[in-house]
Amino acid sequence: MSVDRVMLLIDADNVSVDVIEQAVEWVGKHYGGPHVRRAYCTAESAVQHQQLFKRLSIRPMVNLAAGKNSTDIALAIDAIDLAIVERPAVMVIASSDSDFAPLVSRLREKGCRVVGIGQQGKTGDETQTVYDDYEVIA
């Protein structure tokens, strides 16, 4: 199925390389490929995953700010901005982080269908139920 305006936002500091690869593949299979592919990460992660990002056409969104949740905050700000400006049909967030629950609720209020993708064994049931759909990847 092909859907207009699909956005894939990856918490690259929170999921493995395998999950990133499988997330891109899964989104392509289910929605016809994401129009926006962004990975939010530290500078160290960006360098480490540079070849992966190039191969999968993922734009690294490097966060230079220090702090525990600074990458998560950058992803959340972009997600809201994209929801308002781009009006995507589907927003996919690849993360096993439960901190995104308020963001998911807000995106749904903005009319986005929000799908989560996370790592098996790292995402609690309570986190998964916030999303419209949630795909667990091994």
Residue ranges and their predicted role:
Residues 1-84, 106-108, 113:
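Domain-level signal for Mg2+-assisted phosphodiester chemistry and nucleotide/NA-binding surfaces
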Residues 124-138:
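Structural recognition of alpha->loop->beta junctions
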